[in-house]
Structure formats: structure tokens, C-alpha cells
Amino acid sequence: MVKPTQAKRYASLGAIALLTTSLVVASPNPALAMHISEGFLPLGWAVGWWLAFLPFLAWGLWSLQQQIKQHSESVLLVALAGAYAFVVSSLKIPSVTGSCSHPIGIALGAILFRPPLMAVLGTLVLLFQSLLIAHGGLTTLGANAFSMAVVGPWLAWLTYCGVSRLRVKPAIALFAASFISNVGTYTLTSLQLALAFPDSVGGLATSFAKFGTLFAVTQIPLAISEGLLTVLVWNWLTTYCVAELQALRLLPQEELP
């Protein structure tokens, strides 16, 4: 039997996930994003990135199955991590290129559930965005997922583990993980575009520098903002979901209040 306090926490988590998702889906504003748009990549590159991504997706599906099988109580936290990534990556500001830039929101889930599982959540986020709010596309889903749902989570996790070894406060490790995952994701996106469209004069290096410079104008401030937001959300989780985090052993006991 679920205790009233547990029921309250579950209801709170479910309400946050439902409310934040509905706010984005119901938004009437047109959505432009720095995900690679539908049909933008040449066919060879689109197929190539799909082939590179599929093994990580298969690994993620297995990881998700194991997570739910071993820790069924974590389903709502998994849903919350997915909803958080969906909402945060749907927040957009104009970029100097005439498109928009946005954070990725993938670091929190990577820290909670490890990078393989985030390949599934990140792909679902990108799929819903491409179908519901015109972010990205289906042909470019492989490239977008490889950068946001594979490279982003692994960078977040490795950064978090590395910074945590310095025995700093968890907030610093969380901020660093979120910041690096953002910058790394869009660095790879810049490389993907540069590989597909090398500069006619300077080649790959010049094209990469151009894309990276344009992305950095808006992405670095957004990476800082997401890092701060991730810390705030983590503080909320360690206040209202202490029992769940302890039961799942998602983080060392001493990092919980």
C-alpha cells in the first residue's frame, strides 16, 4: 500500500511532467531550432549517421528495460527526465543565423540513469519535437540523436564523474556536466554540418569554424543557464524524492541531504 507521503510525491512528479509537456505542445509559436532540419543533410550523410546511431539506440532500449525491471519505482523519475529534456530543449531564442538556439536538457537524465538509457529518451524527445513542433526532422533524426542523445549524455556523465572526483560540491559537478554536454553537442552538430558542407575555399576546417562560431554566440549563454537550472531541479529532487534516490542508489548516499 502506498503511503500518503509517497502518493503525494508521485502525484507531484506526474503533475510536473504533464504540465510542462502540455505547455510546450499547446504553444502557438512557430518552432525553429538548431537541430538539423528535415532534408538538409545529403542522403549519404543522413544514412551514415542513422547507422552510427542505431547500435546506441539498441543499447539504450536494453538499458531502459533493465532499469524498469530492477527498479519499477523509477518509472516516474524516468518520465520526468524525459519531460525535462523535452521542455528545456524546446525553449528557443533567436540565433544570428535567423534560426533559433536552445539548451538540450539531457544532462540531468544522464546523471540519474546513465548515458545508455538517455539514447532512448533523447530519441523520443527529438521524435516528438519533429512531429509536433517542427524541430529537426525524420531523415536527420540519426544525426540529431547522435549529437544530443549519445554524445551529450556521455559528455555529461564523464564530466560529472570527473569533477566529482575533485570532491567539490555536487552543484558544481552538475553545472559542469550540463555546460559541457551543451557545448559538446553543438560542437558535434557544427562538425556534422561541416562534413556535409565543407567550405569551397578553406575546406572542412573553415566550415567547422564558421558553424561553431555562429552557434557559440547563443549556445554558450544557454549552456550557462541550463547548468543553473539543472542545479535547481536537482535540489528539488533531493528535497522531495530522497527516498526514491536512496532506494535506486542513483548517487552516493553522502550526496543526499
Swiss-Prot record:
Residues 1-33 form the signal peptide. The lineage of its organism: Bacteria, Bacillati, Cyanobacteriota, Cyanophyceae, Acaryochloridales. The keyword DNA repair does not apply. Keywords: Cell inner membrane, Cell membrane, Cobalamin biosynthesis, Cobalt, Cobalt transport, Ion transport, Membrane, Signal, Transmembrane, Transmembrane helix, Transport. Belongs to the CbiM family. Pathway: Cofactor biosynthesis; adenosylcobalamin biosynthesis. It holds the Pfam family CbiM. It comes from the Bacteria. One of its GO terms (molecular function) is cobalt ion transmembrane transporter activity. This is Cobalt transport protein CbiM. Gene3D superfamilies: 1.10.1760.20.
